[in-house]
């Protein structure tokens, strides 16, 4: 019997796959538990529609990420932060991704998740720092951050 998996089933198939499984396994286990449904014409067309809408949604996300990359990498987009520092230019604390995300939202009205910023270590020095930002699995931008002394 051909079925369309509605969720991942270990050793059998992944969500959205169409596979041939034994009749008893499909009728007694997969279909009653909602893990699969019979692959008839209506279900096949529904799956194709879902696939098209998912692809369209991914394309929109990619376009939005590319647009945001243009804004973030613009020369005028520099996130300004201040902190207390010693005479040698080293800060008494550090600047985290949360502070950068908050400042970016306040200064440019761009809401960005702090987990998308990839800092190897917190920023502890004054001056300009380039922070890599992963906007999409295909799009990575660089955000300029300027840290000045209070």
Curated annotation (Swiss-Prot):
This is Large ribosomal subunit protein bL9. InterPro entries: Ribosomal_bL9 (IPR000244), Ribosomal_bL9/RNase_H1_N (IPR009027), Ribosomal_bL9_bac/chp (IPR020594), Ribosomal_bL9_C (IPR020069), Ribosomal_bL9_C_sf (IPR036791), Ribosomal_bL9_N (IPR020070), Ribosomal_bL9_N_sf (IPR036935). Keywords: Ribonucleoprotein, Ribosomal protein, RNA-binding, rRNA-binding. Binds to the 23S rRNA. One of its GO terms (molecular function) is rRNA binding. The lineage of its organism: Bacteria, Bacillati, Bacillota, Bacilli, Lactobacillales. Belongs to the bacterial ribosomal protein bL9 family. One of its GO terms (cellular component) is ribonucleoprotein complex. It comes from the Bacteria. It comes from Limosilactobacillus fermentum (strain NBRC 3956 / LMG 18251) (Lactobacillus fermentum). One of its GO terms (biological process) is translation.
């Amino acid at each position: 019997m051909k079925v369309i998996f509605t969720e991942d089933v270990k050793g059998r198939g992944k969500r959205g796959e169409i596979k041939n499984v034994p009749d008893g396994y499909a009728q007694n286990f997969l279909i009653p538990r909602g893990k699969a449904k019979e692959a008839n014409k209506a279900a096949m067309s529904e799956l194709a529609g879902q696939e098209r809408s998912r692809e369209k949604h991914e394309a929109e996300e990619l376009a939005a990420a590319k647009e945001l990359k243009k804004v973030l990498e613009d020369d005028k987009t520099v996130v300004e932060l201040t902190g207390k520092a010693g005479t040698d230019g080293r800060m008494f604390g550090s600047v985290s991704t949360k502070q950068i995300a908050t400042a970016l939202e306040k200064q440019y009205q761009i809401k960005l998740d702090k987990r998308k910023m990839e800092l190897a270590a917190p920023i502890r020095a004054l001056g300009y720092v380039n922070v890599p930002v992963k906007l999409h699995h295909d799009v990575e931008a660089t955000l300029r951050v300027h840290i000045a002394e209070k």
